[in-house]
Swiss-Prot record:
Belongs to the DNA polymerase delta/II small subunit family. Heterodimer with subunits of 125 kDa and 50 kDa. Interacts with cdc27, however the function of this complex is not known. This is DNA polymerase subunit delta-2. Its main location: nucleus. Its EC number is 2.7.7.7. CDD domains: MPP_PolD2_C. Gene3D superfamilies: 2.40.50.430, 3.60.21.50. Changing W381R: No loss of function and binds cdc27. GO terms for molecular function: DNA binding; DNA-directed DNA polymerase activity. It comes from Schizosaccharomyces pombe (strain 972 / ATCC 24843).
Length: 462
């Protein structure tokens, strides 16, 4: 018998949806950097004034001095030999290729030495930096920060310290209630990876049965305590080109690319049908929040737009009731908590600059920087906003979810009385992991689905 359960109220508080009438691409991307600098400058100025009260602040990077340390607020720009260049892509391939590969932007040799080229830029100009301090501090292109230092004989700025906006206080303090006898959970999953072969994995079937309450309970855990499932993108596997008899004899690299229109021979509807069936089954007993990822049929640039109802032939009947489609990234008001959720592109791109950093470290950095995706639009595509950078954080989340990560992890960040739970959600197709968050305490545990078993892990409260 399928379990039907009451839900936790969920509202998308900051819907980053772009209507067709709003979308114009004639403007330059410089505007988004200026908007970002304008929004974050007051916060950083306040933080830096407290950190360096006896140091002189200069209004422009071009005014830095050589005889004494001073500090300025600017946007960092990072140059590496392996970083993709869209102009080179267009010149060499006459097309634009999506950057979803895991290849890093920084070579191991450069990462070990810290010998990375940086520049600092504001409204008035740009100055080059020397030393490895910025790379050691985790700085990437697009981060707005205050830097303390002086100009050397070569006219480069020598950085001796940095200051970020930092984690600021919640406008509404988070409340937790550990006295509740019956815990209520939300479940988070990412990277279902439904594929072109049309064969659903046993793990996906187990997940459906578990969420519907038709799979034997795991230990003392009851699926009825799960009130909502959040799918953090990549429901579909990466597209694989389907070779046909006409193209099989064409040597690799010689096949003519179709530049206009859509090549219908390369489309396989099976993954979409599988996703539709999955949602139709799960939504009959539990509320679902569905976010697109880089492999799903949504816009390529951030913020990715919600999946179109036309893709969901069967499950669209649940839209407006138990099925909620959201943008990527998105802000959710979930019960008494404020949730920031992403499909993981922002964190995966940061790890390409700093391969040795974990997903949780990169997530914490975005909080310190007050920006969800600082590498946009340089190496992570986004819409060319003009008047406002919509990825600047105006609030701090209580819960920060990031999907499609290499492994599961969670960390509680405490700063000035704020408690923020960070959760990196791994790809389900590779790990079989379903993450559960107790909405009374924000403690985290996982359930792992395997072909022959379902295993509940020890609750994690760190």
């Amino acid at each position: 018998m399928v379990e039907v359960r009451h839900s936790i109220p969920c509202e998308e508080t900051k819907r980053l949806e772009l209507s067709l009438s709003q979308q114009t691409y004639s403007q330059q991307y410089a505007s988004i950097y200026f908007a970002r600098l304008t929004a974050l400058r007051p916060r950083i100025t306040e933080a830096a004034s407290k950190k360096w009260p006896d140091k002189q602040r200069l209004e422009r990077v071009l005014d830095v001095k050589s005889d004494e340390d001073c500090w300025v607020v600017a946007t960092a720009y990072m140059t590496t030999a392996l970083k993709p260049n869209v102009m080179n892509d267009v010149t060499q391939l006459h097309t634009i290729v999506t950057t979803t590969e895991e290849s890093p932007y920084v070579s191991p040799e450069d990462a070990a030495s810290g010998d990375i080229e940086y520049a600092l830029e504001d409204d008035y100009g740009r100055i080059d930096c020397s030393g490895s301090f910025l790379y050691d501090a985790g700085v990437v292109t697009g981060v707005v920060l205050a830097v303390l230092g002086h100009e050397d004989e070569q006219g480069r700025f020598v950085v001796v310290d940095v200051c970020f906006p930092g984690i600021f206080s919640h406008s509404i303090p988070m409340t937790t209630d550990e006295s509740q006898a019956q815990p209520e959970y939300i479940a988070a999953v990412s990277g279902l990876g439904l594929s072109n072969d049309g064969i659903e994995g046993i793990q996906v079937h187990q997940l459906v049965d578990f969420l519907r309450g038709t799979l034997p309970h795991v230990s003392s855990f009851s699926p009825s305590s799960i009130k909502r499932l959040i799918i953090l993108g990549n429901c579909l596997a990466p597209s694989i080109e389907i070779a046909d008899s006409a193209s099989a004899s064409v040597p690799i690299g010689k096949k003519k690319v179709k530049r206009y229109g859509y090549d219908t021979s390369a489309y396989n509807p099976n993954p979409t049908f599988q996703l539709d069936n999955f949602l139709d089954q799960v939504c009959s007993s539990i509320d679902v929040t569905l976010m697109p990822g880089p492999y799903d049929y949504s816009s390529t640039i951030l913020p990715q737009q919600p999946l179109h109802p036309a893709l969901l032939t069967k499950s669209k009947v649940w839209l407006g009731s138990s099925l909620q489609t959201v943008t990527n990234p998105t802000w959710l008001s979930l019960g008494n908590h404020f949730v920031l959720a992403t499909s993981g592109q922002n964190i995966n791109d940061l790890r390409k600059y700093h391969p040795k950093k974990s997903s949780l470290q990169c997530m914490e950095n975005t909080l310190l920087w007050n920006h969800i995706t600082p590498t946009s639009p340089d190496t992570l595509w986004c819409y060319p906003f003009t008047d406002k950078d919509t990825f600047v954080m105006e609030e701090m989340p209580d819960l920060y979810l990031c999907g499609n990560q290499p492994k599961f992890g969670c960390k509680t960040v405490i700063n000035e009385g704020n408690r923020i739970q960070l959760v990196s959600v791994p790809e389900f197709r590779k790990t079989g992991v379903l993450v559960l968050i107790n909405m009374h305490t924000l403690n985290v545990e996982i359930i792992q689905f395997r072909p022959m078993s379902v295993k509940a892990e020890t609750p994690i409260t760190s």
